[in-house]
Amino acid sequence: MTEKLKGTTTVGIVCKDGVVLAADRRASLGNMVLSERVTKVFQIDDHLAIAGAGTVGDILSLVRLLRAEAKLYRAKVSREMSVKALATLTSNILHSGRGFAYMAWFLVGGYDSAPRLYSIDAAGGVTEDRFTAAGSGMEFAFSVLEENYRDGIPLEEGVKLALRAIKAATKRDVFTGGGVTLVTITEEGYREWSEEELKSLLE
């Protein structure tokens, strides 16, 4: 088989006190669903995270590289990399690999002096956003985000909005499904929400 595991919807939202990153858990090969338990949101450091939409192998490869670079940076300067620095590093890696491109789109979120969110395309183009989505179901997620997002949204409302956006994509996009991974990054650090916590918010 020449096709690769791919397909997903990722969402990022800047809230008053932090950033929300969320993604579905389905991995597909062509028209086949191969897994409903794939993780697509990853912690890079205490206040840094990344979500990937696209080819699973490429996402995991980049995550390993970014984690190593973040550890090296911390060892050299005795502090954590800024969110913008992580986004720039990700962009540089993607841009330098244009001849053998990563088949993925990334959302970088984190908290340094404030919550920040960046989207980075496969060629390395970077955009700072208040909210964004990527992947095969992004247009359905965007419709929910654009209608309901507001500046200064409280973190719990941002979590609920991210879940609604992923749910909208799940209903309409065959490559999105299998549950949700959702994390928040605040001044206190990185936190992955449990399935029970997310379910209670939707009740």
UniProtKB/Swiss-Prot annotation:
It catalyses: Cleavage of peptide bonds with very broad specificity. The formation of the proteasomal ATPase PAN-20S proteasome complex, via the docking of the C-termini of PAN into the intersubunit pockets in the alpha-rings, triggers opening of the gate for substrate entry. Interconversion between the open-gate and close-gate conformations leads to a dynamic regulation of the 20S proteasome proteolysis activity. Its main location: cytoplasm. The keyword Cell division does not apply. Keywords: Autocatalytic cleavage, Cytoplasm, Hydrolase, Protease, Proteasome, Threonine protease, Zymogen. It is found in: Cytoplasm. Pfam families: Proteasome. Belongs to the peptidase T1B family. This is Proteasome subunit beta 1. It comes from Thermococcus kodakarensis (strain ATCC BAA-918 / JCM 12380 / KOD1) (Pyrococcus kodakaraensis (strain KOD1)).
